[in-house]
Every structure is written in C-alpha cells, then in structure tokens.
Amino acid sequence: MELLIMIDAFKRASAKSVTAVIPYYGYARQDRKTTGREAITAKLMADLLTTAGANRVLALDLHSGQIQGFFNILVDNIFATLVLVDYMKKKNFKPEELCAVSPDAGGVRRARYFAKEMKCSIAIVDKRRDKHNEAIAEYLIGDVKDKNVVLIDDIVDTAGTITKAAN
C-alpha cells in the first residue's frame, strides 16, 4: 500500500516518470485461478500499480513470466541468478564439483541457466504437494553425489520446498 501511496504522491508532484522497484512482487503465486471464485491477485496488483501512476516496473525474479503480461506498462524482470553466477565465477568454483539443483519443475529454467553459465551438471527434485504450502520431495533426477549443490529457487516462503529438496 505504501508503494501505491508514494507513486501517487510522485505523480501529483509532477514527476515526469515513476519506476516502481519491486524486489519481491507480493501475490505473485496468485497468477491464475486454481479453484472457482478465486481472485487473480497478481493481476490486481499490476492494475493498482498502473492506476497509481507507475510508468515502469523493475522486479526481481517474478514467479512466472505471465505476470509481465498483466501490465500495460514496461516491466523489467531482473534475474538474481546473474549475480550468483558472477559471484561463483569470481570464487573460481570448479564446474565438475558443482551441481545446480531446481527444487521443483517450475524452477528448471533458472537452474538450467546457472548450469549453462557455470558449465556444471543439473539435477531436479520432483516435488508434490499434499496440502497448501506443504511440499513433499519425491524423487531426485540427476546425480549430486560428491558435488557442491546450489539449490536455486525464486521464492522462499516457509522454506519447506528448499529444505525438503536439500534433505
């Protein structure tokens, strides 16, 4: 709410342009209906930011690419994996000692990017959910034995997914 108020204040003070910088896009996981009578809150947030007067949004690791399509203004989706890759390269990690692991199928693209840039192997945890926010790691696809594992995820909420993937 404070971001919306600030954007409105800037526009009322004759700001030529306002870029909303959003490190964490709240409600990003509500990007589609999963049951009847459910709001698509990620779209509502996009509408509110636009109505408040934002001309551009700079976001970090949006949960899904379709969120960019919810806006009628420019959206830059910056990937934190770029920073991680840069750090790992500077620390001279050996590719044969690393394995990029996605804790679920939805994060494979991020893990694949990291693996490609670091020239290392990749693994994927096949995750299922039995209840809301309760993940169960079922199978590991790939080999992580004797590797330094880099678990790559976009949102850590309860840390259930990433903890179970690590175990």
Residue ranges of each PLM-predicted region?
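PRPP-associated nucleotide enzymes
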Residues: 1-167
